[in-house]
């Protein structure tokens, strides 16, 4: 569904930009009743705020810092030194004035180069008059192959609407860093704020993470919320839109993130190395353009670990989830990774090592897809374990969660924590032994199992299975439609199915289906078996705009639909 919405909204991109520009020129939310400009709550001032560290290149010798001030501050600089020395070095920032939907501010960025590896530094930012408090950072040591980082996702907050409260993620991260003081940086899997095109949301996020990301590099992945906005937020948010690029994200963070992404889509796409690991960060836009860059990027690294992030899970836990938004394009680079971290679904899950939609046992055989839960206490109520998941936790308690990733040479351990310290999953990958713990063998079935979006149709399909005859796959399709909430009428020699605004009538002994789009000729005749009418999988799927595949190694057929609508058969009210 997101891909369809994306295509439609991309067509409206230019129109939306014009609307936004006009809105900004009016300054509707920055003018009082007397026509005077005023600052919003949490707006920029002469004192630096939104201070944040990031890796911009080689973490052994480089570090980037960003901050924000009001426009009265015409220039800025960072003043830094090695801890234990008094010799301060000043580096002037590059800066740019930005008019957002509610404010006008000057944004500052500095990339420090020529630093010493494994060295602690102290720094302040601002201009000659208005300085920040002192913060610290540490560069990566030489020959580092033992380190840890924390990954979080979906810590966005939409309320209170005009002053969003990000204290949940801030509280969680402060606790996590007290629990794991050895962590080197924070990594995210997207949805860092609720509406990334709106300034007040970033104000909330920076307020929540104050006291953390000034001294801990914060490497973000964009999610759909980071990419969206509202034309106006007052008195209530109206005019929701998505842009072709995560414009405000790219503006704020592109200057401090590695400038090595695909042309036209840097900022939200980048890669970096730390220790013996390579990190590939994938934005949600233009996957067909991002994919060649991503694959080429991975071919160039010789790091032991290849870790990636992409907000939308390829193998979802949502009952309506689907993966065709980007996977057809991104499959090639993603299958080069050891782990792909995702978010979006606000629960935890991880897959068996997966490649070509088949499930394996050994980490060398595929990519582990790891959904990181949520860092903001934002819960979903209908998530469930799918056939491709070796581990799952619904996370329906209103508190945040995070994952600690520890790398020690050829061994990686990912430990998933609730905010209060309870552990709900531990995964270890040992490259030397080609072993993934805890032990979990990927299923292989004797009868060809049937699943829809990863949900096994076991209860309704007991003792039923798909069959292959003369190279054609057949299935009791009425059972599939019943299982997903569609309408099914079974009569002596016919089967009527209705779902997703389509319908079809299948008849025993016929290779033709009567549908809402006319007569469809199928690759085989419908037949009775096991008290069900079996019809060809290929044509029946196409009639209902579904996709399907047969995972040969595991012997199951999975149907999918690009729609995230739920075709529930509701009881009539009249």
What are the residue ranges of the model-derived segments?
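Stable alpha-helical elements in mature extracytoplasmic
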Residues: 165-172, 189, 201, 205-208, ...
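Outer-membrane beta-barrel translocator/channel fold
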Residues: 316-327
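Active-site neighborhood of phospho(di)ester-bond hydrolases with catalytic His/Asp-centered motifs
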Residues: 151-153, 185-191, 218-224, 282-283, ...
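Primary recognition of N-terminal secretory signal peptides and signal-anchoring hydrophobic helices
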Residues: 437-574
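Conserved, compact domain cores that house catalytic/ligand-binding motifs in diverse enzymes
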Residues: 147-221, 226-227
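Acidic, histidine-bearing metal-coordination/catalytic regions of metal-dependent phosphoesterases
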Residues: 2-159, 178-179, 408, 415-445
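Acidic/histidine-rich helix-loop elements
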Residues: 86-103, 151-170, 196, 234-243, ...
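Extended active-site neighborhood of metal-dependent phosphoesterases/phosphodiesterases
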Residues: 109-112, 120-141, 200-305, 329, ...
């Amino acid at each position: 569904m997101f891909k369809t919405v994306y295509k439609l909204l991309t067509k409206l991109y230019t129109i939306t930009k014009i609307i936004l520009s006009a809105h900004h020129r009016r300054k509707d939310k920055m003018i009082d009743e007397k026509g005077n400009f005023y600052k919003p709550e949490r707006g920029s001032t002469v004192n630096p705020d939104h201070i944040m560290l990031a890796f911009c290149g080689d973490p052994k010798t480089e570090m980037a810092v960003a901050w924000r001030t009001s426009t009265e501050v015409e220039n800025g600089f960072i003043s830094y030194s090695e801890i234990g020395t008094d010799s301060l070095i000043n580096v002037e920032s590059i800066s740019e004035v930005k008019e957002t939907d509610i404010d006008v501010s000057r944004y500052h960025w500095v990339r420090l180069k020529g630093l010493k590896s494994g060295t602690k530094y102290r720094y302040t930012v601002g201009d000659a008059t208005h300085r920040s408090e002192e913060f610290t950072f540490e560069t990566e040591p030489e020959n580092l192959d033992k380190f840890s980082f924390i990954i979080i996702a979906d810590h966005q907050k939409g309320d209170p609407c005009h002053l969003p409260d990000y204290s949940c993620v801030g509280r969680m991260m402060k606790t996590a860093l007290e629990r794991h003081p050895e962590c080197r940086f924070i990594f995210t899997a997207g949805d860092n704020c609720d509406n990334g095109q709106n300034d007040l949301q970033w104000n909330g996020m920076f307020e929540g993470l104050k006291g953390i990301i000034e001294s801990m590099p914060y490497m973000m992945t964009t999610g759909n919320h980071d990419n969206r906005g509202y034309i106006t937020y007052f008195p209530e948010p109206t005019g929701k839109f998505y842009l072709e690029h995560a414009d405000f994200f790219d503006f704020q963070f592109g200057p401090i993130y590695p400038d090595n992404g695909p042309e036209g889509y840097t900022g939200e796409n980048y890669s970096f190395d730390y220790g013996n690991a390579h990190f590939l960060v994938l934005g949600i836009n233009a996957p067909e353009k991002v994919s060649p860059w991503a694959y080429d990027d991975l071919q160039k690294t010789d790091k032991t670990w290849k870790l990636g992030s992409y907000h939308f899970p390829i193998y979802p836990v949502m009952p309506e989830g689907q993966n065709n938004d980007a996977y057809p394009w991104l499959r090639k680079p993603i299958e080069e990774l050891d782990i792909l971290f995702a978010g979006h679904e606000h629960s935890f899950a991880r897959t068996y090592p997966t490649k070509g939609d088949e499930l394996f046992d050994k980490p060398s055989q595929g990519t582990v897809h790891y959904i990181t839960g949520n860092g903001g206490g934002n819960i979903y109520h209908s998530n469930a374990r799918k056939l491709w998941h070796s581990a799952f936790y619904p996370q329906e308690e209103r508190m945040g969660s995070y994952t600690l990733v520890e790398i020690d040479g050829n061994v990686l351990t990912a430990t998933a924590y609730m905010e209060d310290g309870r552990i709900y999953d531990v995964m270890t990958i040992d490259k030397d032994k080609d072993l993934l713990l805890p032990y979990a063998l990927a299923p292989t079935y004797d009868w060809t199992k049937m699943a829809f979006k990863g949900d096994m149709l076991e209860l309704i399909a007991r003792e039923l299975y798909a069959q292959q005859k003369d190279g054609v796959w057949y299935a009791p399709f009425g059972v599939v439609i019943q299982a997903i909430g569609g309408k099914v009428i079974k009569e002596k020699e016919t089967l009527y199915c209705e779902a997703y605004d389509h319908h079809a009538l299948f008849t025993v002994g016929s290779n033709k289906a009567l549908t809402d789009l006319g007569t469809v000729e199928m690759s085989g005749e419908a037949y009775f078996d096991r008290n069900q009418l079996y019809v060809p999988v290929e044509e029946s799927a196409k009639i209902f705009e579904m996709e399907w595949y047969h995972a040969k190694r595991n012997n199951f057929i999975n149907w999918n639909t690009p729609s995230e609508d739920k075709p529930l058969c509701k009881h009539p009210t009249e």
